[in-house]
Amino acid sequence: MRLRCAVLDDFQDVATTLADWTPVQDRTEVVSFTDHFASEDELASALADFDIVVTLRERVPFPASLLDRLPRLKLLIASGMRNSVIDYAAAERNGVTVCGTKSTSTPPVELTWALLLGLARSLVTESNALRSGGPWQSTVGADLHGRRLGLLGLGKIGSKVAQVGLAFGMEVTAWSHHLTKERADEVGVQLASTKDELLATSDFVSLHLVLSDRTRGILGAPELALLRPTAYLVNTSRAGLVDQDALLAALHEGRIAGAGVDVFDVEPLPADHPMRTAPRLLATPHLGYVSGNNYRTYYGHAVEDIEAYLAGAPVRRLGGSRCATRPGRPPASYTPKTRNPTHLENPR
């Protein structure tokens, strides 16, 4: 009997076309779900008969309460190599191996700049006015050249955002708890002496931090109050870094020029959520990692993870997960191909 594999939150219905699943089709039945499961009960019911689950990033939490209800689950694959919403101890206790995939940092860098440029030049406002027969040239754009870009975080993504800012002729400064002058010099940016200094002196602020107990809520009402009324804030990192209610208040009261947000406390965002109608907000539905190349990598590596698991030698394991698997050697190197295997299903 073949194992059953569920692919969650395949909103664009592309999991079956952006990777070649034929290496595992004889041993695995793959089912893609294009709708989001809103509750744990719904998710537990839908996944009860699956041995393998593929989930994208941190869209779906896997706490102990859910893992305990999935006795058939043996392999959980999460795209990327870091996931904070999986209870790894519970996975190990339930005999579930957790594996990841590689990814590229380029797409979130590109989206960061799409949001920043969209804000600076009021692209949505101007485009909507043009399409609806509204006023011709109703706004005056904010310049980038010579302005200060403040980055909270200078890791793999933040440093690439910095390079683009420098290419625009911006003055780039950065800060994080562990950022050193040597690292700032290496990237070619200035090191802000404090977080408050960066916020108070920047024309554009962009967040590129890992969400942790230390960084959660790093921008609350007191920090947002430091921003200039002409400043723009961009968050393509994690929703938990910013106090959402404080940001909404700042936008409604006009205390900052605008914000570009790609991540939210609840995803997908409910239809009546206040972030959908907030003024001065350019919002996107968590598109930071959503690109063709990234998805080819995610799903291609998911196939490779399944092959390796079936061979008894799981690869890219996350959280120290362990389970009993048959002995064997890892599969040969796999290169994703674009095709649409006929055996795949999409029930929703």
Label every model-predicted segment:
Residues 45-48, 58-66, 178-274:
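Rossmann-like adenosine-cofactor binding region
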Residues 158-159:
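N-terminal Rossmann-fold NAD(P) dinucleotide-binding loop
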Residues 98, 216, 230-348:
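Rossmann-like dinucleotide-binding domain for NAD(H)/NADP(H)
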Residues 30, 97-98, 172, 191, ...:
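Hydrophobic beta-strand scaffold residues
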Residues 52-55, 78, 206-207, 235, ...:
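Redox-cofactor binding/interface segments in oxidoreductases and associated redox assembly factors
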